Amino acid sequence: MPTPHSAAPGLSERTPQSVKQQWLAILSVAVGAFALVTSEFLPVGVLNDVASDLGITAGRAGLMVTLPGIMAALAAPLLSVGIGAMDRRYLLTGLTLIMIIANTIVAFASDFNVLLIGRVLLGVSIGGFWATAIALSGRLAPKGVGVAKATSIIMMGVTLATVLGVPVGTWLSGLMGWRMTFLVTALVGVPVLLAQIFLLPPLYPDRAIRVKDLPALFTNAQARVGLIAVLLIGLAHFAAYTYVAPFFKQSAGFDGSTIGSLLLLYGMAGVLGNVFAGFAANRSVRNTLLLVALMIGTSTALFPHFATGITGAAMLIALWGFAFGAFPACASIWMFVVAPKDVERGMPLFVALFQVIIALGSFFGGQIVDQLGSSVLLSLATALVGAGFATVLVLGRNVSNNVVAQPA
């Protein structure tokens, strides 16, 4: 997700708060972001359990990832335009409440159709959150504190959820079952909701985003190169990674405890990858994105051959986790390097694209894994990553960090 330097233009000045209140408000949004993104990716780690419990295939269970992505892709631009002059404080707390309700529905769902209703609601919450989160980070920053620092705290919640949500979900599912895992995630949202109600200041806009603002990034040639690369690499990742747990169970024969440990290793490596990207991509985003694509492609290419043994699986899942941990930062910094003035206006459609990638990747990955198997899926993912690598190498050859995306 993009990370801004400053508050979105057109937002009114914040009301006076103590520095402590401001930091607590930022923390409440960060923890909310962690819970929200964890909820989105949680099914990846529990697909086997859900499929077995409800008597469905792993591919069909993958709709738990696909549907929220579709709804979030629709909600991001629609809400960003439709909320108009509404106080963003009420929007954010309302979206947190929707997340709590959605996870509770999943936890107590009597069948798969009811479960999917909860996941659709979650998608609305995800899309709405990202339609406003960037502007919120700028508004909440204490005086004298760089907006990028405040934003980085919120984005750390997102990054940790992206790379740790799956392994933590798998671990909790092994301890107490997948239903209780979703219920725990819902309960985490309750103190977050209360904190937001009492700590967030009024966030009235002076000027809302207009429909004509949305395609800002798509009209910039070098931004389009980045968007194409993000599309190809992201599709490959979400198509393949969504079904890593079934691969480990069916092809490698690992038990649930081993799978959980491997996914935790992925998450730990992802945190390191995120830190690496913060340094490397701010120096050369093109070279860093090329390296990320190379690492993901290497992982997916070697997975069918070497990930059936514990040593090979550990090495490849760690490499994959490190690479994807760096991927969101690379995507964000690319946009700031090539189109710094367009990121704010183009953010809702950027969010929509990312959610479409998640939805399409998990959907087509499910179809392929059900019909053709995991090895074919991983081979196709490798080809997509290769296409993304070539896009950056050839079409992005003129991209350089002459404009610093984010001050250190």
Predicted regions: what they are:
Residues 118-157:
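Cytoplasmic helix-loop-helix junction between adjacent transmembrane helices
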Residues 102-105, 113-122, 311-319:
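Paired small-residue
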Residues 338-374, 380-381:
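A late C-terminal transmembrane helix in Major Facilitator Superfamily
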Residues 110-114, 143-200, 247, 255:
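Helix-loop-helix hairpin linking two adjacent transmembrane segments in secondary transporters
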Residues 55, 87, 108-114, 253, ...:
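Helix-breaking motifs and short loop linkers at transmembrane-helix boundaries and internal kinks
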Residues 287-331:
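C-terminal transmembrane helical hairpin of 12-TM major facilitator-type secondary transporters
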Residues 75-88, 273-285, 369-370:
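Helix-to-loop junctions at the C-terminal end of transmembrane segments
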Residues 74-113:
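Conserved MFS/SLC helix-loop-helix module at the cytosolic interface between two early adjacent transmembrane helices
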